[in-house]
Amino acid sequence: MVKLRLKRCGRKQRAVYRIVAIDARSRREGRDLRKVGFYDPIKNQTYSNVPAILYFLEKGAQPTGTVHDISKKAEVFTELRLNQTKFKFNQ
């Protein structure tokens, strides 16, 4: 099972996180399948590769709670719904 979760980077007391698609059995610092975003809680900056996130969500990846909240702020789930409705109408 693939999860979208945070991977810690940065130095002591200055944590920044990468949003990665990773196998659920891997540890936090394990090898990721793909980097799909970036989150800096200190500067409150976020970057999301929305097409990559949508790809993994459509394939069944489960986001963790924090990644879900970050994605909701970036309005990823509204784009996911739009893609699903377009797919239904095209069939």
From Swiss-Prot:
PANTHER family: 30S RIBOSOMAL PROTEIN S16, SMALL RIBOSOMAL SUBUNIT PROTEIN BS16M. GO terms for biological process: translation. Coiled coil: none annotated. InterPro entries: Ribosomal_bS16 (IPR000307), Ribosomal_bS16_CS (IPR020592), Ribosomal_bS16_dom_sf (IPR023803). PROSITE patterns: RIBOSOMAL_S16 (PS00732). GO terms for cellular component: chloroplast; small ribosomal subunit. Keywords: Chloroplast, Plastid, Ribonucleoprotein, Ribosomal protein. It comes from the Eukaryota. This is Small ribosomal subunit protein bS16c. Belongs to the bacterial ribosomal protein bS16 family. The lineage of its organism: Eukaryota, Viridiplantae, Streptophyta, Embryophyta, Tracheophyta. HAMAP family: Ribosomal_bS16 (MF_00385). It is found in: Plastid, Chloroplast. One of its GO terms (molecular function) is structural constituent of ribosome. The keyword Chloroplast applies.
